[in-house]
Each structure stands twice: as C-alpha cells, then as structure tokens.
C-alpha cells in the first residue's frame, strides 16, 4: 500500500476544510431593510420574474415575522408561485396563510387566490388548444376551486372579490353539468 507524505495529506485536509467553510451562496440581502427587500420583490413581481420574487418574499416573511408585512409577503409569494406555474406550492402557501392568520383582513383575498389557482388548474394551454371543456377534465381542481369561491361568498359577501367568485362558481356549475 503506497504511503502518502504527511505534508501532502495535510495539504489535502486543509483544502477540504477551506472548501467546507466557503460560502458559495452569499445572501445579497444580508444588510437590507425589510422595506428594501419588499421593494425588490415587488420589482421582480412587476417584471414577471416570479422565480426571483419567491426567494425574496421568503426572506421577507422570515425577517418581518409576526407583522402585517410578513402576511403580505406570504400572499405575494403565493401569487408569484401561482403565476410562475408552481400551483401546488401556491395552494400550500395559501393553506398555511389561512391556518396561521384566520382573522387577517386579507383572508378574503387568500380564499379568492386559492380559488383562482384551482380554477386555472383546469384551464391549461393543452386544454385551451384542444378545446376541451371543464366537464371532460379532472374535476377535483374544479371542486376545490368552487369550495374556495363558495366560502369566500358565504363568509365575505361584501368583499370586492365576491362578484367575480360568484361568476366563476356559475361557470364551474354550468361546465360540470354538461
């Protein structure tokens, strides 16, 4: 069995330790205020860079924990996930928001967004191109959407989101009845 010189072994060990201590992913937001993080996240959202907005909103949620800004970050993260095509993550984020903040003034929006995520789950590009209607697709998402819209209309009849939710409920009922 070959013997390695002690100096070579020491050099390899030192290089390994240095590599382990290196931080390849420095946090560019380390010195930022919550307002700056929020502004950057909004810029990414407005520019359609949803994949860049999500990590910023996650950082904001952690740094502003327990504040209305953290709640706003959760909702905007769900929106970014939805628009970025991460629908399952958006629903999970909204479910978490609703569990943690049942008395939030934005609870109606959370229900509406959850309804939209599931509603549009059935309206993908393939379905549109094939002219396939809602009654021919998996109906679980439609039922979940209907339930979110129904809860919104029942609990928040005066919400600004309720009229659109009712229209979408009618569409779902008519589509499933075909």
Explain the meaning of each model-derived region:
Residues 6-13:
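Sec-dependent N-terminal signal peptides
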Residues 2-5, 17-178:
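Acidic, polar-rich low-complexity tracts and alpha-helical solenoid repeat scaffolds
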């Amino acid at each position: 069995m070959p013997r390695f010189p002690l100096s070579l072994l020491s050099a390899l060990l030192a290089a390994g330790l240095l590599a382990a201590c290196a931080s390849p992913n420095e946090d560019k937001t380390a010195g930022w205020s919550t307002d700056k993080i929020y502004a950057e996240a909004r810029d990414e959202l407005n520019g359609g860079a949803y994949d860049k907005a999500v990590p910023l909103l996650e950082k904001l949620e952690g740094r502003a924990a327990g504040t209305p800004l953290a709640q706003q970050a959760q909702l905007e993260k769900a929106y970014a996930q939805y628009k970025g095509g991460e629908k399952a993550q958006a629903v999970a984020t909204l479910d978490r928001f609703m569990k943690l903040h049942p008395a939030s003034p934005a609870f109606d929006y959370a229900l509406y967004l959850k309804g939209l995520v599931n509603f549009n789950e059935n309206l993908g590009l393939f379905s549109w191109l094939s002219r396939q209607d809602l009654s021919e697709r998996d109906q679980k998402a439609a039922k979940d959407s209907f339930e979110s819209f129904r809860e919104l209309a029942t609990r928040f009849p005066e919400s600004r989101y309720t009229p659109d939710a009712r229209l979408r409920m009618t569409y779902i009922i008519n589509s499933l009845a075909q």
